[in-house]
């Protein structure tokens, strides 16, 4: 996937999850292993499905509110169960995303990058996923860094969060990989810095942290000043 300038009038749009993950993967951001198919071809994709590790998640790709619209099926434990779910997929039209569920989950973060009125980009690191509500009233619920960010500044921001003790394995929870978390946040920041004219905002919620890595479950907001088209990834 490449980004190419376009001279037409600016217009904001949200990219589909599939497109978002293609872009993030190109910049080295880990994403769950996945397969893109559709209802009619689901049974024909046995070879590719066999490469996925169960449990998996099945998602319709055409809506920003997948869970509310019945377009998400979680914790699918076998290929047989996956095929049987076809009978419940009346609301899904178009492509289907099947991806491995990530675990064990140590914690979830929200990573956001937005442009202010002066044209500077600000990196926001906060509690994400289920922790957003749990720590919403905490004093240190989020940290802000003006880009470009360094590894030290990101580490300092993470250590300032109320959620930070979970990185150390709070009360028996699996430890979260701090080093990988910092590396992934740096890669997300690089995406914006290298394409500052194409992207206006990124929000990844959640960034899933495990004992071994950090994975993006993203939604990207881009300007249509940038045209996405398929090409060889670098």
Predicted regions and their residues:
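ATP-dependent carboxylate/acyl-activation modules
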Residues: 1-234
């Amino acid at each position: 996937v490449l980004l190419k300038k376009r001279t037409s009038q600016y217009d904001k749009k949200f990219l589909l999850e599939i497109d978002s993950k293609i872009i993030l993967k190109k910049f080295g951001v880990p994403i769950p292993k996945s397969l893109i198919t559709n209802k009619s071809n689901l049974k024909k994709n046995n070879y590719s499905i066999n490469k996925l590790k169960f449990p998996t998640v099945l998602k319709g790709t055409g809506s920003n509110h997948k869970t509310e619209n019945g377009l998400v099926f979680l914790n699918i434990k076998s290929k047989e169960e996956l095929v049987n779910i076809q009978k419940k997929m009346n609301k899904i039209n178009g492509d289907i995303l099947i991806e491995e569920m990530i675990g064990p989950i140590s914690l979830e973060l929200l990573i956001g990058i937005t442009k202010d009125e002066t044209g500077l980009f600000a990196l926001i690191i906060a509690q994400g996923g289920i922790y957003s509500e749990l720590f919403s009233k905490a004093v240190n619920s989020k940290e802000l860094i003006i880009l470009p960010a360094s590894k030290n500044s990101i580490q300092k921001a993470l250590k300032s969060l109320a959620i930070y003790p979970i990185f150390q394995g709070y009360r028996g929870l699996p430890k979260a990989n701090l080093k990988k978390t910092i590396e992934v946040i740096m890669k997300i920041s690089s995406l914006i810095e290298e394409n500052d004219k194409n992207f206006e905002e990124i929000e990844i919620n959640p960034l899933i942290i495990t004992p071994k890595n950090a994975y993006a479950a993203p939604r990207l907001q881009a300007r249509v000043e940038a045209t996405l088209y398929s090409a060889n990834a670098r």
